[in-house]
Amino acid sequence: MHFTFLALAAAGLLMLVQTTAAEAQFKYPAAPTSNQVDEYKGVKIADPYRPLENPDSPESRAWIEAENKITFDFLKAIPERDEIKKRLTEVWDYERFGVPFKEDGHYFFSKNTGLQNQNVLYATTNFSEAPRELLDPNLLAKDGTIALGGLDVTEDARLMTYGLANAGSDWQQWKVRDVTTGKDRQDLLDWVKFSNASWKKDGSGFFYSRYDKPDEKDKLRSQVYNHKLFFHQLGTPQSEDKLIYERPDQKEWLFNAEVTDDGRYLIITVQRGTDPKNRIFYKNLADPNSKVVELLDKADAEYNFVDNEGPVFVFRTNLDAPLGRIISIDTSKALKIDELISESKDKLEAVSSVGERFVAVYLQDAHSAVKLFKRDGSPDGEIALPGLGTAAGFTGKRKDSETFYSFTSFTTPTEIFRYDFDKHASELLFRPKVKFSPDDYTTEQVFYQSADGTRVPMFISYKKGMKRDGQMPTYLYGYGGFDISSTPSFAPANLVWMEMGGIYAVANLRGGGEYGEKWHEAGMLHTKQNVFDDFIAAAQYLIDNKFTSTQKLSIGGGSNGGLLVGACITQRPDLFGVALPNVGVMDMLRFQKFTIGWAWTSDYGSVDKPDDFAYLYAYSPLHHIVKGCCYPAMLITTADHDDRVVPAHSFKFAATLQAAQGCDKPTLIRIETKAGHGAGKPTTKIIEETADRWAFLVKELGLKVSK
């Protein structure tokens, strides 16, 4: 009864049509509304802006156009915006490389000359020579909205298959290119989503996963189910692809396949949505009639295939080891797990098998440490890193004597290294030449207490010489979900923010993967509130320790991090000066009804379960906006082609906030066109959006920018 009253009361408040102070200043457009009321477990909840869930209706299109006009007019009028964009463009304009990988003496890597919208794929046999351009996505669309989404090369380096994503969509189209000639073959695969590709060792074809063709009108909004694993025979139409595995009885399962280094087995990783706990199946490729074997079918832990020695498979897992360990399983015998490398005090983030060694990347308080182990699991030294940052890559094969990796930090642009196993030494392969001095900036790591006493780490980066007077404009970023770790990384956008005099802080919230599965579990489902408490405590730490003040503090996050921002400003609107939620999940009662939203129930829960509903409703940002409350200045960002977190979340959140705002602080929404959830976004669009974000902060936080 109490729940019903609160729900109806909130709905009634939001449906009132009055002119608030903010509306009077900005004259927000009237959003299309309805009398929609839903009932959840006996609780009636109004959803007045339900029509905005259809972004293609004439009413929604008119609203989007009107909102964008208000937002862009406001942003363009900020005097500092042009100067910010100019500096962003200068800082962004530096040559950068991706981590190389090798096939048959050929090195493949991505490169961007600086301001290219998309990275270009290159190949070479010698790094001292000029590489050969292999694939330039910039030539496929004038506006740079077609991006390379995936890649796999045959063992003889003769052919490659690659996926293309259009306008930021999760849907991809896969093609096959001749590496020697640089020309595409006739092979064309559609409706690929959430899939890699893996060639057979003889190069006759590759394995991949896809969905059935969706309804064209609703392909960016409708739910997707029934992933299927196929084998594509080179030179044949997609209609003749061989179905390898499907599970109609498990419509939410996702399949990714990998051919082992020796070519004998197909390893099938089976996941239900975003749940890190997965299953491992395999197929014996030496026997055309072999069936798929369900090796690990309980989904009782996370299992990542590392390598095999004949029928003995090696995995990284958190089974009985929340921080991770390495195990082996002899598939020719009864299921028995042998431990190769035991759990340590640090999170085992990734493992690869290269040059007769295991390369293990650990997280030590959210930054990387790399250790080497022999095949029997005995220690074999470490790979020294340049500092406190993030190392990634370490790809290769058993026969290789080298591997490649990247290193980055909040103040160090990504550098590429080659490690020689024979010499036990790293060689700097590439260091970018940038238009600023990294030595002018510093990062410190602090630890603070959350509401329940939990010790939480946070990185704080800024320009040296900063005065800690409690008045520094600060941008606090967080994510806190899905077992994803927020580790140090360089972004030109953040450098420019620090250059202007701002502080950039990243809180390592529960729900992430920084300290293993227990850390993740402490911020998911019915403990999700811990994530918001951690973020609020991070903000309070920055204020109490004289880094900033409420008036000078802004917060931001994307996707699950957008949810974080939405929840925190509805729970503590008094604590923040500005909020920048990006492609956020704002409607926790309907998220699972769109595209891949159902896949997030492993972290969020489901409104179909009574206990989950109570928790979801308790923090759902859309449902905790109170009319007349003064909320922080807000620039909400989303994209019209986001088919992961559909823009309806941001649309309804913005419309509700605009109707409720009780003071003259702006509530603006910036809706990017021909863009998706963020992956593959063109450089030009990133710079424009970043210029708008920083200009908004400059104006609302009162930051003075010198030319």
Question: What residue ranges belong to the model's regions?
Answer:
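Cap/lid segment of the alpha/beta-hydrolase catalytic domain
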Residues: 138-154, 163-170, 180-186, 419-425, ...
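A flexible loop/linker signature enriched in serine peptidases of the S9 family
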Residues: 112-119, 141-145, 164-173, 188-193, ...
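Bacterial N-terminal signal peptides
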Residues: 7-18
